[in-house]
Amino acid sequence: MLAELGFIRTIGENDEVPVEPESDSGDEEEEGPIVLGRKQKALQKNRSADFNPDFVFTEKEGMYDGSWALADVMSQLKKKRAATTLDEKIEKVRKRRKAEDKEAKSGKVEEKEGQADSDLKGQENPGEDEAGSKDEDSETDYSSEDEEILTKADTLKVKEKKKKKKGQAAGGFFEDASEYDKSLSFQDMNLSRPLLKAITAMGFKQPTPIQKACIPVGLLGKDICACAATGTGKTAAFALPVLERLIYKPRQAAVTRVLVLVPTRELGIQVHSVTKQLAQFCSITTCLAVGGLDVKSQEAALRAAPDILIATPGRLIDHLHNCPSFHLSSIEVLILDEADRMLDEYFEEQMKEIIRMCSHHRQTMLFSATMTDEVKDLASVSLKNPVRIFVNSNTDVAPFLRQEFIRIRPNREGDREAIVAALLMRTFTDHVMLFTQTKKQAHRMHILLGLLGLQVGELHGNLSQTQRLEALRRFKDEQIDILVATDVAARGLDIEGVKTVINFTMPNTVKHYVHRVGRTARAGRAGRSVSLVGEEERKMLKEIVKAAKAPVKARILPQDVILKFRDKIEKLEKDVYAVLQLEAEEKEMQQSEAQIDTAQRLLAKGKETADQEPERSWFQTKEERKKEKIAKALQEFDLALRGKKKRKKFMKDAKKKGEMTAEERSQFEILKAQMFAERLAKRNRRTKRARAMPEDEPTGPAKKQKQQQKSVFDEELTNTSKKALKQYRAGPSFEERKQSGLPRQRRGNFKSKSRYKRKK
């Protein structure tokens, strides 16, 4: 009856309901069939036939507004001459290659059918070439045999932990070191109404563990030394108590009261964005002073004395020495975010200089994901009676992260590029971050993946600030699917929606690995990391498997798939070289144009007026900066690596050849990581200095000492045991006499009789 009227009927007691079988997570499982890129596009087209393609939701999904406060930052960027982008160059080379391939194919046809017939066909159908080129652009050239190979599924195996031997105790590094009220909510923290309104507007429901522990202590005005895993909301943990303090105690004069130091420009922009959103309903002003942005506009903003200044150490020192009205004597709160990273880089001397110039009567908050010896030294110098907050272990990965590893066989290091290309074209097609060890390899991977037809961006130190922000914006807005980055993007950046992190090589240390994979599975979301592990990196893999709480998977790609992609990359080597040549030509053109511009400017102004412009001063001389850079650089001339004949020979051979092979490139990436690990091991072997803060490493179990029973008057009188009588007859012991101040017992003048003497 209900079915006839078009209603959905209810399920009866005797009706059987088909239940979908749950996915079995056994020791070995095979993923579903691979769907290639062009088939996915065709499926998407068929699905969207019923819907209007121009329809857009008015509200974006996410925790808070997607604008990311980039508009005002982009306006401060240094305006440079517009040049062709790398993607345009890649597209140009791709079109040229397709045209050459088409000519080669048409040449074969001409040999068979005759030149005259082909000419006639060309005259009759002049529009065929354009249509064909469009079809080729939309589809990748895969034959039926190739599709059979490329659609083979990968195999996943569970990597078992090795059982611990008896006597090996697990180290409890920072675990359960801090206690906090787990039922605490934002409403219970006594925050002002404007802040609670901003928290609600940003979509925060419950505070994270680090926020529950830090915000109440920060509101008391105490110094904080906090250590928590990456992606746990440290920015809001220090921003909320600072904003509450500024609202509660308004400023009397126009001075900057809060300084936030960050290691990278991108992290600075992110902290500035979050702070601005938290302060949107109050009159607190913020300013961003990082490298790459216009110096003059920053100086103008600093003269207005903003309440909160977010800066990188280098640009801050530049302003302190060259902006007369700007100083740090009025700073009430100093925040050091990602302190371990700042001391890893070349910021050590700069950090000391900034702390020296800050006000002594200040509250200091030090936040770090890892607690290294350098961070402890910095804490002992900058903090006064700090409250130590360690929420969880710094070697913990996110709880919902699925870790996968791909083994690289011995003498097959050159397969890394082919494996990454296979993963990105077959399995992980969007919202992917690919980490490399060097800037050169990141740039090469961008070109290579671009030539394979993928939407790629890159993020590393060789790019200008405009290019960095543009890459981040495009990745966030889903204009590009893959972001190739070095460790510059491995810390603190909260890029929403990252599904997969791929490691081209294993990073320097386990801590760096934790930071890299921390870009995904953030704030309770699920994510996946895939790392390529060679024979030289097996030791680190064992450490990661040992520390993992969830089972770790081993992914196995079919060998014929790897060979197919390896052949494909070998064919693209000429195109990669062509793109690099175009870049080199453009760079030379820009340099010559810049020289002409400077010459014209000098002629227009006159040499005298040009010389009158004051040079920007710095707290170190050029020679001191050069020495510091060489001392910390990981190059063949590094003092720590002298005598390593193998490595020096490898570097020399690579320089002689000029262009390295795929295996040599992979070897160079691993070599860089090993160099860093070696330096770290040397640093750890140094004798440790005495610190103001107590050590956090757990000491060994103390031996239990037997407690001596105190002398009791009535017990001594009533105790008639053999031992008690013996002690009573012997009288007080030497210690008892000493404590009570009795004179020592004098020995008598007893002499043994001659009969007891030994006979000679």
UniProtKB/Swiss-Prot annotation:
Q: Where in the cell is it found?
A: Nucleus, Nucleolus; Chromosome
Q: Does the keyword Nucleotide-binding apply?
A: yes
Q: Which reaction does it catalyse?
A: ATP + H2O = ADP + phosphate + H(+)
**Start-end of Basic residues biased regions:** 682-691, 744-760
What GO CC terms are in its UniProt record?
chromosome; nucleolus
Which parts of the sequence bind ATP? 228-235
Biased composition regions of type Basic and acidic residues, renumbered to the chain: 98-122
The record's family statement is: Belongs to the DEAD box helicase family. DDX27/DRS1 subfamily.
About its domains, the entry says: The C-terminal domain regulates nucleolar localization.
Oligomeric form and interacting partners: Associates with PeBoW complex, composed of BOP1, PES1 and WDR12. Interacts directly with BOP1 and PES1.
Which protein are we looking at?
Answer: Probable ATP-dependent RNA helicase DDX27
Q: Which organism is it from?
A: Mus musculus
